[in-house]
Amino acid sequence: MRILSIIRIIGILVMCFSGTMLVPAFVALIYGDGGGKAFMQAFMLSLIAGTLLWWPCHHHKQELRSRDGFLIVVAFWLVLGSLATLPLLLFDSPHLTIASAVFEAFSGLTTTGATVMTGLDNLPKSILFYRQFLQWLGGMGIIVLAVAIIPLLGIGGTQLYRAESSGPLKDQKSLPKISEVAKALWIIYASLTVLCAIAYWLSGMNLFDAIGHSFSTISNGGFSTHDASIGYFNQASIYWVTTIFMLIGGVNFSLHISAFLALGKRNIWRNYWKDPEFRFFLTMQIIFIGIVSLSLYGYGLVSDINEAVTKGALQLTSMSMTAGYTIFDIDNLPPFIGLLLVISAVIGGCGGSTTGGLKAIRTLILWKQIDRELHSLIHPNLVQPIRIGKNRLAPRMIESIWAFFIIFILVYWGCVFAVILCGMNTFDAMGAVFATLTNAGPGLGFIHESFIGVPESAKLVFSFAMICGRLEMFSLIVLFIPSYWKK
């Protein structure tokens, strides 16, 4: 284990992250809301912390191994989340406890979208911008965004990319060099954000709301600058902009990269449609949106079919992309609709996207595995390999997906048990852990709108669940294996 080299890298990344505090400080200056001091203090403290980590180890530039990448990813997320709490603690309004600030910061960085803050409409613009900006930074994963500069630091970036990337096919690279992948991600991610902000602005949002919501829409984070979430605007055009860009953020970004490289060369739509996961993902979205829309109309929750489709598409997409935007009180929806929303959140979006959940590719492979087992019962001698497109999946790949599913269940019930010990009842604990572990945001029970009333200790458990969900279990759980720390 190259501990000193790892500390050096963490220090450099923390120093880079400290610079992000200057952006909301500039926003505070523009609006004159008095928040600049808190962000400048947070900037200085973060910069000092990064320097103290980096300087004693700055001569250690050993090449990282694969196992080192996992520790860097987890350590950086924990350190980053801790530093991200500083502005929230330094502000006089809102006045947050340490546990609440930790919860809010990790919810932003992991793009969960759950919140312990209320009265958003009356908060300083700079703190509202900061929450949105945190989700934008966390959307693609801080480490993936940083790998473009990792080669400049004297180490290779492949291990970090593999540890942070999501989805079971993450060993497949979209481009030969990881720095090129990261740069392409930056260009695409930033371009989509700008397009989303323009679309919001043209649809009637003011510039501040348009920029803020573009951050949380592309990242599928779900934070809003208003207590009523996206429902504050109550406008169909804004709802459709939200739905479309959430879906774009829910697509595997390797497909976006391929489409970006193929501009002007071939039919871009074919580039997406030939991907089995994308076809499964889009088909499931259309089916779920249709069912939810018809259900909303059938239950009389909307006035006409157009409103049903508009609101059904938004609410279903928000849950399935684990974004966290809400226009309905989920806890008071008919059980059938609520169940569909929960199922969609469990499935999530595509691997390699900004969404949470199990991911569409894993769901597709598990479905094919179940189908094969059922056919094997009928034809015991049948040899039927599982294929995704033209690729035949190795047994090891299928085993890893089942292992992920089992780990997901174990972590879920472990967190539920821990939250119950913190004082929450079973139903609320199950709903809250589901919301945080899948990074979906809205919970069930009394936390369906805000986590402000949960015990302080439970907020720390939820923060752990968010990190587990964001790093897809294994990247974090592997650190608890004793053999990981052996030479």
From Swiss-Prot:
Domain of life: Bacteria
This protein's UniProt keywords: Cell inner membrane, Cell membrane, Ion channel, Ion transport, Membrane, Metal-binding, Potassium, Potassium transport, Transmembrane, Transmembrane helix, Transport
Membrane topology term: Multi-pass membrane protein
Region entry Selectivity filter part 1, spans: 110-115
Bilayer-spanning residue ranges: 3-29, 36-57, 66-90, 125-150, 178-202, 278-298, 394-421
Residue intervals on the Periplasmic side: 30-35, 116-124, 203-205, 225-234, 327-334, 422-423, 444-455
GO CC annotation terms, alphabetical: plasma membrane
Region annotation (Selectivity filter part 3) ranges: 321-326
Pfam families: TrkH (PF02386)
Location (main, coarse): membrane
Cytoplasmic side: 1-2, 58-65, 151-177
Coiled coil: none
Region spans: Selectivity filter part 2: 219-224
InterPro entries: Cat_transpt, TrkH
Intramembrane segments: 98-109, 110-115, 206, 207-218, 219-224, 235-250, 305-320, 321-326, 335-346, 347-359, 424-425, 426-436, 437-443, 456-467
GO biological process: potassium ion transmembrane transport
Record carries keyword ATP-binding: no
Binding site for K(+): 111-112, 220-221, 322-323, 439-440
One MF annotation (Gene Ontology) recorded for this entry: potassium channel activity
Region (Selectivity filter part 4): 438-443
Subcellular compartments: Cell inner membrane
Chain's role: Low-affinity potassium transport system. Interacts with Trk system potassium uptake protein TrkA and requires TrkE for transport activity.
Family: Belongs to the TrkH potassium transport family.
Name of the featured protein: Trk system potassium uptake protein TrkH
Species whose genome carries this gene: Haemophilus influenzae (strain ATCC 51907 / DSM 11121 / KW20 / Rd)
Gene: trkH
